[in-house]
Amino acid sequence: MLLQQRSHQKYHSGGLWSNACCSHPVAGEDLKEAARRRLNEEMGFDTEISPIFHFIYKAEFDNGLTEYEFDHVFTGEYDGLVTFNTGEVMAFSYKKMNEIKNSLLAEPGNYTAWFIQAFPRIEEWWRKKYEPVSSHTTGQDPFA
């Protein structure tokens, strides 16, 4: 899974690890198109994406800001060059699902509030999609 470490220039959650990108659509913009636009603006690439779930998230931040949002989660596949926007992102990393899960349990303070809330459902979706295929074809757990 592709993760980004948010730039310290962000108005909240700077330096924390999170999903590949986040966005708010502009008035009249389709949600999927907004997500693809921001993926390109933040991570420097475009790929086909599909919605997998949505959730309501609420968090209060150290700077006094409170977010209360209805978030949509999309997924896609990409194995090309990542040329991230340094105003948005300070680093990126590809991680296995178990690595993320273990890190979230050991060091939750390294992750954004919304990613902590979304990850269990992302992991559930991932297992349903990939576990039956990989365990039958290779006999190995792709999450280890």
Labelled PLM ranges:
Residues M1-E41:
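Conserved Nudix-box catalytic region and its N-terminal flanking loop in Nudix hydrolases
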Residues L3, P51-F53, Y94:
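Structural signal for conserved beta-strand scaffold positions within catalytic alpha/beta enzyme cores
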Residues Q4-H8, H12, T47, L65, ...:
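N-proximal short alpha-helices
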Residues G15, A27, I56-F61, L65-A144:
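Nudix hydrolase/Nudix homology domain
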Residues C21, P51, H72-F74:
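A structural signal for short, well-ordered beta-strand segments
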Residues G44-D46, L81-V82:
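Secondary-structure boundary elements
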Residues F45-F55:
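A short coil-to-beta-strand element that immediately follows conserved catalytic motifs
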